[in-house]
Amino acid sequence: MPSVECNTTAAKEHVSEAERMIQMVKERIRGLLATLPFSHVPKRMKIEFVYFVILWLNAFPVKSGISQTISPRELLMRWHLDYKIHCRVQPGTYCEVHNEPVPMNTMVWRAHEAIVLGPTGALQGSVKLYCINTG
């Protein structure tokens, strides 16, 4: 692997590579928000969509990166994301999740309405959810 070159900048000076990356992340988030059928998106959902976009940007190798075949995420975590596990549900999908804090034999509603925020990035393929009732 090639050596890493560190180039520091002065205060108030822009780094074009970082600025381009920020612009690309914003474009991806805007694209994701445009696919949602909601007129209002809560702030917490927007924050989680940033995590979602960064997760997938780091899941693929970068042409100008350290390795041409290994993704930045795989370099750090030592394992890669699997399509069958981590792409089961699209972000913004409505779902009802089961909740049973204490076993009871009552007719209380045990499902919560939620919106999928994206995968957590864990090996098991867990998914982050936004509860509509509680936020």
What kind of feature is each model-predicted range?
Residues 1-135:
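Nucleic-acid-interacting cores, centered on viral/eukaryotic replication and modification enzymes
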